[in-house]
């Protein structure tokens, strides 16, 4: 019982080992899996061999594995034999109970032993493992000790190695820095070391500027000078810079000598060809250009090197200037005599034709300037102002020949044509399209143009004074209207001949109807007078029929318009038009004295219309500004200060001092006056038209106006208290007298109106202009008759009105009607 209790207690304690809530000996998942595998294997253990057959047979057949059925002994004896043999009792027999219990005890002991054998074997097996594990632990501990020692040694060696590595890196860094420093020093010293090499090459007698090594040596020399110049803090800086400068001077001297000798040799070769004669224009190109162009490649490469360095190094710029000067001197030496000879020859050929001389001379200089620029570009790549200076000097020879001729030209036609040639043909057509090459030539041409314009302005002033202001008209110039009638008759006869022979056109007919029409605008048809184109040209509109001063003024202005500046033209046009208007006024007065007043008035109106029409195409203002000094305030202030009443105010120390007032109030004023020639023409035209209208109105209605004036005076006297009157009883206002007055006025209109209209048609020859000019006259006459009709109705009876027999307004309008 005690053993059962102990076994039960042990099992309870064993059950607590792996209890879920509080396990005393918890197993890992792997250990649990191992136990489960062992449990599954134990469930299929074979039946022990020593088990009695009866026990074996008593076992349920389903509980025995299939494998055991094959090993069941054939007889009980064999089983018992094996069991006794295993117990060492094969010779014994159980015959008594004591033997049985003894056998049973042995069997139980044997079974207990057999049952504990596997545990002991496992214990022994595990003990072996334990011993091996202890040995391994000892080895591991020993290895750990060795590793710890090795780690200490490794740390020691690592520290030493790191220190050595850092030292090596520092040494390598210092070595690299020293190498870089040495290389940097060597690089800097290389510029200094080049001195001996360059100096040796420059002192070599075989050195030539055309050799292959000269340009690279020159580049090295430039680099050395540039480097040393940029490091003035180097030791021996002045010494080396001076030595390199000396080398540069030698190199520049070699280049200058070679270039100058080449250019001078070319010049000498050309001059030695024919020293006795000056080259003419035909072989000048061959002599002066072909040779130089052939020699250009010899020096162009060298000059390019100089030009590339000229902006960086001043010595090269000086050398380039010297080469430019040498080249231009040689060109001047060659071209100077040739150009002078050619200009002289052109002058002798065109001595009387100034325009042809200017054209040929300018064309020659244009070719010279273009050829010189092209030749210069063969030698040089960069421009220079010295070339233009040379060309300007060469153009001076042309100017020196032309100027004496220009200042002696007196004809405005020649001067205006010269202006047109220089301004249009030369400057606009040639210079503007090639301004770079012809810049120097343009300066000379502009100077010539200024001289021609100045001469033209001067001659224009003289022309205005002599030929316009001082013009003395010939009798034929004032033969109006006779010359117009004669020209009209000639034109009519030509028309009649043309009708008879329509297929034949005479020269005179073409000249009258076509030539003048194409060259002139239709005169008298201005915008303000409502123009209407005409199919034929009136004799008054022919250019040759204009008054000479008008023709001269317009021709003069037409020549000046495109030749001089706008401001100068405005001043001259003002002067010319003013002189022309004065001459027309004088001519009109002379015609009025010699012929009739209407002839003088229509002459003036016609020519003022021509003037206004012909100056309209000039797209400019005919306005000039005149400045004058107005001394009126100064004069008033002076009279005021000289007044005896103001003498005490001289000594006042306030703003009422007389001297201060004189200084403040006596300042002269500057006045500006604007003179407009177009407005002046319009003003005189308006005045002439008004005079014509007034004169014609007086001619046709003066008697009636005088009668109405007397009636107005009589009414005034009566209204002021005078005696009452009856107009028909007045001696001068009797119906018969008034009838004579009306008949005379009507007869005057009927007889003289056709003459007036005929004169207007003869002078103006434009229906629109005639209608516009006569319309105010007709209106004035109509107003006079309307007033007269009103007076008759007011002052006379119907019987008296019948006696007076004044024409009706319809009759008057029919008489005054003028078809447009």
Swiss-Prot record:
SUBUNIT field: Component of the conserved oligomeric Golgi complex which is composed of eight different subunits and is required for normal Golgi morphology and localization. Interacts with TMEM115.
Chain segments carrying region Disordered: 1-26, 496-535
Family according to the record: Belongs to the COG3 family.
PANTHER family linked: CONSERVED OLIGOMERIC GOLGI COMPLEX COMPONENT 3, CONSERVED OLIGOMERIC GOLGI COMPLEX SUBUNIT 3
GO biological process per UniProt: endoplasmic reticulum to Golgi vesicle-mediated transport; intra-Golgi vesicle-mediated transport; intracellular protein transport; retrograde vesicle-mediated transport, Golgi to endoplasmic reticulum
Keywords: Golgi apparatus, Membrane, Phosphoprotein, Protein transport, Transport
Subcellular compartments: Golgi apparatus, Golgi stack membrane
A Pfam family assignment: COG3_C
Major location category of this protein: Golgi
Modified residues (Phosphoserine): 655
Presence of the UniProt keyword Methyltransferase in the record: no
Disulfide bonds: none
Top-level taxon: Eukaryota
InterPro entries for the chain: COG3_C, COG3_N, COG_su3
Membrane topology listed for this record: Peripheral membrane protein
Segments of skewed composition (Basic and acidic residues): 1-21
Originating organism: Mus musculus (Mouse)
GO CC term (a single one): cis-Golgi network
UniProt name for this protein: Conserved oligomeric Golgi complex subunit 3
Protein's job: Involved in ER-Golgi transport. Also involved in retrograde (Golgi to ER) transport.
UniProt feature, compositional bias: Polar residues: 523-535
């Amino acid at each position: 019982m005690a053993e059962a209790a102990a076994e039960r207690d042990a099992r309870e304690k064993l059950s607590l080992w792996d209890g879920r809530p509080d396990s005393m000996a918890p197993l890992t998942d792997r250990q649990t899996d191992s136990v489960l595998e062992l449990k599954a294997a134990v469930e299929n253990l074979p039946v022990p061999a020593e088990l009695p057959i009866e026990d074996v047979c008593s076992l349920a057949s389903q509980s025995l594995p299939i494998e055991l059925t094959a090993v069941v002994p054939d007889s009980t004896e064999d089983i018992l034999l094996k069991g006794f043999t295993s117990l060492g009792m094969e010779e014994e027999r159980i015959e008594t109970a004591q033997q049985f219990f003894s056998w049973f005890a042995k069997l139980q002991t044997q079974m207990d032993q057999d049952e504990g054998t596997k545990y002991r074997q496992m214990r022994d097996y595990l003990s072996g493992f334990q011993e091996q594990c202890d040995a391994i632990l000892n080895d591991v501990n020993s290895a750990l000790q060795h590793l710890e020692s090795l780690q200490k040694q490794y740390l020691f060696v690592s520290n030493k190695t790191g220190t050595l590595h850092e030292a090596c890196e520092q040494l390598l860094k210092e070595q690299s820095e020293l190498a870089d420093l040495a290389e940097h020093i060597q690089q800097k010293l290389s510029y200094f070391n080049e001195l001996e090499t360059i100096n040796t090459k420059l002192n070599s007698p075989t050195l030539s500027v055309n050799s292959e090594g000269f340009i690279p040596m020159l580049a090295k020399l430039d680099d050395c000078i540039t480097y040393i110049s940029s490091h003035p803090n180097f030791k021996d800086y002045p010494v080396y810079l001076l030595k390199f400068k000396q080398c540069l001077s030698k190199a520049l001297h070699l280049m200058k000598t070679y270039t100058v000798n080449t250019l001078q040799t070319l010049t000498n070769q050309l001059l030695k060809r024919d020293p006795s004669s000056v080259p003419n224009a035909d072989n000048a190109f061959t002599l002066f250009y072909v040779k130089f162009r052939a020699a250009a490649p010899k020096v162009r490469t060298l000059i390019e090197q100089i030009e590339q360095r000229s902006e960086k190094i001043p010595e090269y710029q000086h050398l380039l200037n010297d080469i430019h000067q040498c080249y231009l001197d040689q060109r001047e030496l060659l071209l100077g005599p040739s150009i002078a000879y050619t200009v002289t020859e052109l002058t002798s050929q065109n001595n009387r034709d100034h325009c042809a001389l200017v054209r040929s001379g300018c064309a020659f200089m244009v070719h010279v300037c273009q050829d010189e620029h092209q030749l210069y570009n063969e030698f040089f790549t960069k421009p220079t102002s010295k070339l233009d200076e040379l060309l300007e000097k060469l153009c001076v020879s042309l100017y020196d020949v032309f100027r004496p001729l220009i200042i002696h030209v007196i004809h405005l036609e020649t001067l205006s044509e010269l202006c047109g040639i220089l301004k249009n043909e030369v400057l606009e057509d040639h210079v503007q399209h090639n301004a770079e090459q012809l810049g120097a030539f343009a300066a000379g041409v502009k100077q010539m143009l200024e001289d021609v314009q100045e001469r033209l302005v001067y001659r224009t002033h003289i022309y205005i004074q002599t030929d316009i202001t001082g013009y003395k008209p010939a009798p034929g110039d004032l033969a109006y209207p006779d010359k117009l009638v004669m020209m009209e008759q000639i034109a009519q006869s030509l028309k009649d001949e043309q009708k008879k022979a329509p297929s034949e056109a005479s020269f005179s007919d073409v000249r009258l109807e076509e030539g003048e029409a194409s060259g002139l605008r239709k005169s008298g048809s201005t915008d303000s007078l409502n123009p209407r184109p005409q199919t034929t040209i009136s004799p008054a509109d022919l250019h040759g029929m204009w008054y000479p001063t008008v023709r001269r003024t317009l021709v003069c202005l037409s020549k000046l318009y495109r030749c001089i500046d706008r401001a100068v033209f405005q001043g001259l046009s003002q002067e010319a038009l003013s002189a022309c208007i004065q001459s027309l006024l004088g001519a009109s007065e002379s015609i009025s004295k010699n012929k009739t007043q209407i002839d003088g008035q229509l002459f003036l109106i016609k020519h003022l219309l021509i003037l206004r029409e012909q100056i309209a195409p000039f797209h400019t203002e005919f306005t000039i500004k005149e400045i004058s000094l107005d001394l009126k305030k100064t004069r008033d202030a002076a009279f005021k200060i000289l007044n005896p009443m103001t003498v005490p105010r001289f000594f006042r120390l306030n703003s009422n001092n007389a001297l201060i007032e004189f200084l403040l109030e006596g300042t002269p004023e500057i006045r500006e006056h604007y003179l407009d020639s177009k407005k002046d023409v319009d003003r005189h035209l308006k005045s002439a038209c008004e005079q014509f209208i007034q004169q014609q109105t007086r001619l046709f209605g003066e008697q009636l106006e005088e009668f109405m004036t007397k009636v107005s005076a009589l009414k005034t006297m009566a209204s002021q208290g005078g005696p009452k009157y009856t107009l028909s009883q007045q001696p001068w206002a009797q119906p018969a007298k008034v009838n004579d007055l009306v008949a005379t006025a009507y007869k005057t209109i009927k007889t003289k109106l056709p003459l007036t209209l005929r004169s207007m048609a003869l002078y103006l020859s434009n229906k629109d202009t005639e209608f516009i000019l006569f319309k105010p006259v007709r209106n004035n006459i109509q107003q006079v008759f309307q007033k007269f009709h009103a007076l008759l109705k007011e002052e006379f009876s119907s019987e008296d009105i019948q006696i007076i027999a004044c024409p009706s307004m319809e009759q008057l309008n029919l008489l005054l009607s003028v078809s447009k």
